[in-house]
Amino acid sequence: MMFISLVHHPVYDRRGNIQTSSITTFDIHDLARSSTTYGVERLYLVHPSPLQRQVAERILGFWEVGGGKEWNPLRSQALEVTRVTASLDLAIEDATKLTGEKPVLVATTAKTKEGQTTFGQLRKNLDRPTMIILGTGWGLAPEVIDRCDLVLEPIWGPTEFNHLSVRAAGAIICDRLLGKRNI
Protein backbone atom coordinates (compact mmCIF):
# COMPACT_ATOMS: atom_id res chain seq x y z
CA MET A 1 0.00 0.00 0.00
CA MET A 2 1.50 3.33 -1.03
CA PHE A 3 0.90 6.81 0.36
CA ILE A 4 2.18 10.18 -0.83
CA SER A 5 2.80 13.19 1.39
CA LEU A 6 3.28 16.59 -0.21
CA VAL A 7 5.27 18.60 2.34
CA HIS A 8 5.19 22.41 2.31
CA HIS A 9 7.37 22.96 5.40
CA PRO A 10 10.26 22.72 6.01
CA VAL A 11 11.42 23.07 2.40
CA TYR A 12 14.11 25.08 0.64
CA ASP A 13 13.55 28.25 -1.34
CA ARG A 14 15.60 29.05 -4.46
CA ARG A 15 18.34 30.67 -2.35
CA GLY A 16 18.76 27.63 -0.10
CA ASN A 17 16.89 29.07 2.88
CA ILE A 18 14.34 27.02 4.82
CA GLN A 19 10.83 28.27 4.13
CA THR A 20 7.16 27.38 4.02
CA SER A 21 5.66 27.21 0.53
CA SER A 22 2.06 27.80 -0.46
CA ILE A 23 -0.47 25.15 -1.39
CA THR A 24 -1.38 25.36 -5.08
CA THR A 25 -4.48 24.20 -6.89
CA PHE A 26 -2.36 22.60 -9.62
CA ASP A 27 -0.47 20.44 -7.12
CA ILE A 28 -3.70 19.27 -5.49
CA HIS A 29 -5.46 18.36 -8.72
CA ASP A 30 -2.55 16.83 -10.59
CA LEU A 31 -1.15 14.79 -7.71
CA ALA A 32 -4.63 13.53 -6.81
CA ARG A 33 -5.22 12.45 -10.40
CA SER A 34 -1.87 10.63 -10.53
CA SER A 35 -2.50 9.08 -7.12
CA THR A 36 -5.91 7.78 -8.12
CA THR A 37 -4.69 6.52 -11.50
CA TYR A 38 -1.93 4.47 -9.87
CA GLY A 39 -3.89 3.25 -6.84
CA VAL A 40 -2.19 5.32 -4.14
CA GLU A 41 -4.15 4.87 -0.92
CA ARG A 42 -3.90 8.48 0.30
CA LEU A 43 -2.39 11.76 -0.80
CA TYR A 44 -1.60 13.97 2.19
CA LEU A 45 -1.26 17.73 1.77
CA VAL A 46 0.99 18.67 4.69
CA HIS A 47 0.98 22.33 5.73
CA PRO A 48 1.51 23.93 9.15
CA SER A 49 -0.57 27.04 8.42
CA PRO A 50 -4.26 26.82 9.38
CA LEU A 51 -5.11 29.35 6.66
CA GLN A 52 -3.35 27.34 3.95
CA ARG A 53 -5.07 24.16 5.13
CA GLN A 54 -8.38 26.02 5.00
CA VAL A 55 -7.68 26.99 1.38
CA ALA A 56 -6.96 23.36 0.52
CA GLU A 57 -10.11 22.16 2.30
CA ARG A 58 -12.17 24.73 0.43
CA ILE A 59 -10.77 23.56 -2.91
CA LEU A 60 -11.47 19.94 -2.01
CA GLY A 61 -14.95 20.79 -0.77
CA PHE A 62 -15.89 22.44 -4.04
CA TRP A 63 -14.92 19.34 -6.01
CA GLU A 64 -16.13 16.72 -3.56
CA VAL A 65 -19.51 18.08 -2.46
CA GLY A 66 -19.91 21.45 -4.17
CA GLY A 67 -20.69 22.45 -7.73
CA GLY A 68 -17.50 20.89 -9.02
CA LYS A 69 -18.73 17.38 -8.28
CA GLU A 70 -21.58 17.74 -10.77
CA TRP A 71 -19.48 19.66 -13.28
CA ASN A 72 -16.59 17.15 -13.34
CA PRO A 73 -17.29 13.87 -11.51
CA LEU A 74 -13.93 12.38 -12.55
CA ARG A 75 -12.02 15.15 -10.80
CA SER A 76 -14.21 14.65 -7.76
CA GLN A 77 -13.36 10.96 -7.78
CA ALA A 78 -9.63 11.69 -8.07
CA LEU A 79 -9.69 14.06 -5.11
CA GLU A 80 -11.28 11.47 -2.80
CA VAL A 81 -7.81 10.15 -1.87
CA THR A 82 -6.67 13.57 -0.62
CA ARG A 83 -6.37 14.52 3.04
CA VAL A 84 -5.14 17.80 4.51
CA THR A 85 -2.97 17.61 7.61
CA ALA A 86 -0.91 19.99 9.75
CA SER A 87 2.19 17.83 9.98
CA LEU A 88 4.01 14.87 8.53
CA ASP A 89 3.59 13.15 11.90
CA LEU A 90 -0.20 13.31 11.53
CA ALA A 91 0.01 11.88 8.00
CA ILE A 92 2.18 9.02 9.27
CA GLU A 93 -0.24 8.43 12.15
CA ASP A 94 -3.20 8.22 9.75
CA ALA A 95 -1.38 5.82 7.41
CA THR A 96 -0.39 3.69 10.40
CA LYS A 97 -4.02 3.48 11.54
CA LEU A 98 -5.10 2.40 8.05
CA THR A 99 -2.50 -0.35 7.70
CA GLY A 100 -1.73 -1.39 11.26
CA GLU A 101 1.96 -0.62 10.83
CA LYS A 102 4.12 2.46 10.37
CA PRO A 103 4.90 3.01 6.70
CA VAL A 104 8.42 2.95 5.34
CA LEU A 105 9.26 6.65 4.88
CA VAL A 106 10.89 7.44 1.54
CA ALA A 107 12.29 10.93 0.95
CA THR A 108 12.61 12.31 -2.56
CA THR A 109 15.26 14.68 -3.85
CA ALA A 110 16.62 15.93 -7.16
CA LYS A 111 20.16 15.60 -5.78
CA THR A 112 22.30 12.50 -6.11
CA LYS A 113 23.51 11.22 -2.73
CA GLU A 114 25.36 8.12 -1.61
CA GLY A 115 23.18 5.21 -0.53
CA GLN A 116 20.03 6.20 -2.39
CA THR A 117 17.45 3.53 -3.16
CA THR A 118 16.74 2.87 -6.82
CA PHE A 119 13.25 2.73 -8.25
CA GLY A 120 13.77 -0.96 -9.01
CA GLN A 121 14.79 -1.76 -5.44
CA LEU A 122 11.84 0.12 -3.97
CA ARG A 123 9.37 -1.37 -6.45
CA LYS A 124 10.40 -4.88 -5.34
CA ASN A 125 9.77 -3.97 -1.69
CA LEU A 126 6.32 -2.39 -1.85
CA ASP A 127 4.81 -5.28 0.11
CA ARG A 128 5.06 -3.06 3.22
CA PRO A 129 3.13 0.20 3.59
CA THR A 130 5.29 2.91 2.02
CA MET A 131 5.01 6.70 2.17
CA ILE A 132 6.68 8.71 -0.58
CA ILE A 133 7.51 12.18 0.73
CA LEU A 134 7.61 14.95 -1.87
CA GLY A 135 8.89 18.42 -1.12
CA THR A 136 7.55 21.62 -2.61
CA GLY A 137 9.62 24.74 -3.25
CA TRP A 138 13.18 23.66 -3.99
CA GLY A 139 13.01 20.41 -2.05
CA LEU A 140 12.79 18.87 1.39
CA ALA A 141 14.86 20.27 4.25
CA PRO A 142 17.46 17.95 5.82
CA GLU A 143 15.34 17.46 8.95
CA VAL A 144 12.67 15.72 6.85
CA ILE A 145 15.13 13.66 4.81
CA ASP A 146 17.05 12.60 7.93
CA ARG A 147 13.97 11.06 9.55
CA CYS A 148 13.20 8.90 6.53
CA ASP A 149 14.10 5.24 6.20
CA LEU A 150 15.15 5.59 2.56
CA VAL A 151 16.03 8.30 0.07
CA LEU A 152 14.88 7.62 -3.48
CA GLU A 153 17.26 8.23 -6.36
CA PRO A 154 16.60 11.37 -8.43
CA ILE A 155 14.64 11.28 -11.67
CA TRP A 156 16.98 11.78 -14.60
CA GLY A 157 16.19 12.12 -18.27
CA PRO A 158 18.78 11.99 -21.06
CA THR A 159 20.02 15.54 -20.33
CA GLU A 160 21.72 17.25 -17.40
CA PHE A 161 18.62 19.39 -16.75
CA ASN A 162 16.96 18.21 -13.56
CA HIS A 163 14.27 20.56 -12.28
CA LEU A 164 10.85 18.94 -12.52
CA SER A 165 7.71 20.33 -10.97
CA VAL A 166 6.59 18.34 -7.94
CA ARG A 167 3.50 17.33 -9.94
CA ALA A 168 5.59 15.87 -12.76
CA ALA A 169 7.95 14.16 -10.32
CA GLY A 170 5.01 12.65 -8.44
CA ALA A 171 3.52 11.25 -11.64
CA ILE A 172 6.84 9.76 -12.75
CA ILE A 173 7.43 8.21 -9.32
CA CYS A 174 3.94 6.67 -9.36
CA ASP A 175 4.52 5.24 -12.80
CA ARG A 176 7.96 3.83 -12.01
CA LEU A 177 6.79 2.22 -8.77
CA LEU A 178 3.21 1.22 -9.53
CA GLY A 179 2.82 1.34 -13.31
CA LYS A 180 2.36 -1.67 -15.55
CA ARG A 181 5.67 -2.86 -16.92
CA ASN A 182 4.75 -4.70 -20.10
CA ILE A 183 6.04 -2.08 -22.53
Feature locations, PLM:
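RNA substrate-binding interface of SAM-dependent RNA methyltransferases
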Residues: M1-A110, A171-N182
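Short, well-ordered alpha-helix to beta-strand connector turns
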Residues: V40, K102, R128, C148-D149
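Long, charge-patterned amphipathic alpha-helical coiled-coil/hairpin "stalk" segments used as oligomerization
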Residues: A107-V144, P154
